[in-house]
Design a protein with these regions (language model features):
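Cytosolic regulatory regions of ion transport systems
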Residues: 1-194
Length: 194
């Protein structure tokens, strides 16, 4: 199974390692090169520095045709943007966005994005540990709304930014991985967004 992960923070790196060890084809994108230090030296997937909210970067990285797309950065808005691109523009059917804010998680699920709410999962885990009934704060929400795929670029305004991709590690390489271009507003460079 081909799995694309945007965000190589603690969660993203752990998920990437787990699915790599299970023998899946794993591609990890992050805007910070240092984020890939979290991956073990045994990681056999592809690690690319690039902006997962940039459609051109996702395409050049090889995200099209993925079986699963996981947006796991620390930024709710970045995760939703990446998830929407994956579902609507790349046509990936199984897309999950990690969301920290439970109110946003429900709203995004209504827009057709499956959400994984860390806050809800934590409350559920504490309830379970203490033997309490569930507080009702959802940890995982399936999409209740609908998104439409848009594959016809000719019908949309052209974008002027070609994102940058750089191979930073991993067991495989990509011929597109060394392509680079200047991107205005390439995004946050703090670990909180990685």
């Amino acid at each position: 199974m081909k799995i694309v992960i945007v965000g190589c923070g603690r969660v993203g790196a752990s998920v990437a390692e787990a699915y790599d060890q299970k023998g899946h084809e794993v591609l990890v994108l992050d805007i910070l090169t240092a984020a890939f230090d979290r991956l073990p030296s045994s990681f056999g997937g592809i690690a690319l520095r690039g902006d997962g909210t940039d459609e051109d970067v996702l395409k050049r990285a090889g995200a099209e045709g993925a079986d699963v797309f996981l947006a796991l950065t620390e930024g709710d808005n970045r995760n939703v943007m990446a998830a929407q691109l994956a579902a609507e523009e790349l046509g990936i059917e199984r897309v999950i966005a990690k969301i920290n804010d439970p109110l946003r998680a429900k709203a995004y699920a209504e827009l057709g994005i499956a959400t994984l709410c860390r806050t809800g999962l934590m409350v559920d885990a504490i309830d379970h540990y203490l033997g309490f009934p569930s507080s009702g704060l959802p940890g995982m929400l399936a999409p209740t709304g609908h998104h439409e795929a848009h594959h016809d670029r000719a019908s949309r305004p052209a974008t002027n930014a070609a994102g940058s991709l750089t191979t930073v590690g991993g067991g495989q390489s990509s011929s597109e991985s060394t392509t680079s271009a200047t991107v205005p507003n390439a995004g946050p460079t703090t670990p909180q967004e990685a």
